[in-house]
């Protein structure tokens, strides 16, 4: 092993033993070129370092190995990274979260290129747990995990990292990019869409669309298209975006989504045949955007919406009459829709198989059972927790030096503009 590499190993050991993590981070940031020049000796360097005691040194070596234009032995490197992430010292790597996240991004890209996304899911879950200060902290690796889960069509491993509300972002030594934030909410929305949790999906797409921005983002555009479709499926109309949404959404993103606005407009007429015609007209656009599946679900939701409207007019109705009024192919398809809607709790009804009559009922929920009271308690606790968080954030802003300086400056400006009472 070359003397420069030996010096690197000795410095890593010494600084790690002394607990001088800041200086160690400076060393590994400067050593990238040295390690890249000695690629053939890097496995020897790894053998000389202990993963637990010298986590930052091992991280630097693995990061450089993955940064090479071509990885000679991917399987060996994958095993090394997998072992490192599962056994490294979490306290140490939090000093170099930018490099650690960078290693995870490299691993993700390599697995995506090799069409092996499933292999990285468990590894990235461990990586996030090592990086996070708490479960409500968002890291750039969250987006990687969601991407792999989507590509592997294995959604559930991402849920523990999506079901929590994020209140903090891991800065990653200034390396955290807005792209990672947008991708987390866009991919997360797609995961929830795949699981048909449309309420949560709509929230995630909204977060991506309402992110403060000065320029058009392709991720925001795609989120906006899916936001329209999921709104129609869930609510039967397009939910209005909050007032704090960036002006670029109205100025640039809406004109780029004309086909989707047309779809929403036709949907509001409650006419399935017109909606089918519009879907045929814009099928190329919807297919290109990979949204045809959602568009078909919009059409299905319109049939359901029209069936729900019938419950407000009729107490009983034949399946044949229902199929005719809702523009379904026949009583069999009408029965299929009604059964699914009963199962999902979207309507309360029963079907008499003898005469093919559907009887509509009132909602049996009286809102007086223990489960309902428990739900109310849980919602109240969430409100109390939110109130406490807002107070803490308000206090944090109040003592922020920049805020104090700015508010003092504005007060001086105000007092300067007021005429003196003694003049």
Swiss-Prot record:
Report the residues modified as Phosphoserine. 407, 410, 423
What are the boundaries of the signal sequence? Answer: none
| Superkingdom assignment | Eukaryota
Q: Taking every annotated instance into account, which residue ranges of this chain make up the domain PCI? A: 197-365
Places the protein is found: Cytoplasm; Nucleus
Q: Where is this region: Disordered?
A: 402-423
Q: Which SMART domains match?
A: PINT
Q: Which UniProt keywords apply?
A: Acetylation, Cytoplasm, Nucleus, Phosphoprotein, Signalosome
- N-acetylalanine found at: 2
- GO cellular component, as recorded: COP9 signalosome; cytosol; nucleoplasm; perinuclear region of cytoplasm
Instruction: Report if keyword Phosphoprotein is assigned.
Output: yes
Purpose of the protein:
Component of the COP9 signalosome complex (CSN), a complex involved in various cellular and developmental processes. The CSN complex is an essential regulator of the ubiquitin (Ubl) conjugation pathway by mediating the deneddylation of the cullin subunits of SCF-type E3 ligase complexes, leading to decrease the Ubl ligase activity of SCF-type complexes such as SCF, CSA or DDB2. The complex is also involved in phosphorylation of p53/TP53, c-jun/JUN, IkappaBalpha/NFKBIA, ITPK1 and IRF8/ICSBP, possibly via its association with CK2 and PKD kinases.
Family (UniProt): Belongs to the CSN3 family.
The subunit field of the Swiss-Prot or TrEMBL record says: Component of the CSN complex, composed of COPS1/GPS1, COPS2, COPS3, COPS4, COPS5, COPS6, COPS7 (COPS7A or COPS7B), COPS8 and COPS9. In the complex, it probably interacts directly with COPS1, COPS4, COPS8 and COPS9. Interacts with CK2 and PKD. Interacts with the translation initiation factor EIF3S6 and IKBKG. Interacts with ERCC6.
- What is the protein name for this chain? COP9 signalosome complex subunit 3
* Lineage, opening ranks: Eukaryota, Metazoa, Chordata, Craniata, Vertebrata
Q: Which gene encodes it?
A: COPS3
